[in-house]
């Protein structure tokens, strides 16, 4: 596998889609970012790309109802999936999102990895576990990012990471767990390295072709 190092600071907004049927052509490599509505998904993407407003952060959880696509380089896309599990969203909308997320993870051919973000103080809620299950059953590698890591002391942080690593063992898939803080820039390099390894396939194909 070719080793690559992409410049995530060059990432730019590509397009938005209301659901999987309106996504662009299923080609290249996509990596999805998923998480509960208040997990800090937009903040994490902005920290990775060093762009304050790339992914719009909202004080109202559940605001991101569209699938937003960002291009790192041609054929390398980051996909910001709608946040899930926010109480104020009508039940019907919630179920529709969940169906859409499940459909995307199971059917999108160019999807090569899933980053699932969880608040380090409230990890592994039911819907988080559902997402891990879907990803693992689709044979997709998963990076679990425990966000807002700056809210805990270093020892509490290590303890939570260890606890989550043990708790996910029954899923039996390729699941990695890391602490992440956009504020203190904890885990940003690890996220970039993992994304590089997932995107590397496209460059290997290019060289072989």
From Swiss-Prot:
Necessary cofactors: Mg(2+)
S-S bridge residues: none
Matches recorded under Pfam families: MMR_HSR1
GO biological process: division septum assembly
Binding, Mg(2+): 42, 64
The keyword Cell division is annotated on this UniProt entry: yes
Function in brief: Necessary for normal cell division and for the maintenance of normal septation.
Name the record gives this protein: Probable GTP-binding protein EngB
Organism: Glaesserella parasuis serovar 5 (strain SH0165) (Haemophilus parasuis)
Taxonomy of the source species: Bacteria, Pseudomonadati, Pseudomonadota, Gammaproteobacteria, Pasteurellales
Gene giving rise to this polypeptide: engB
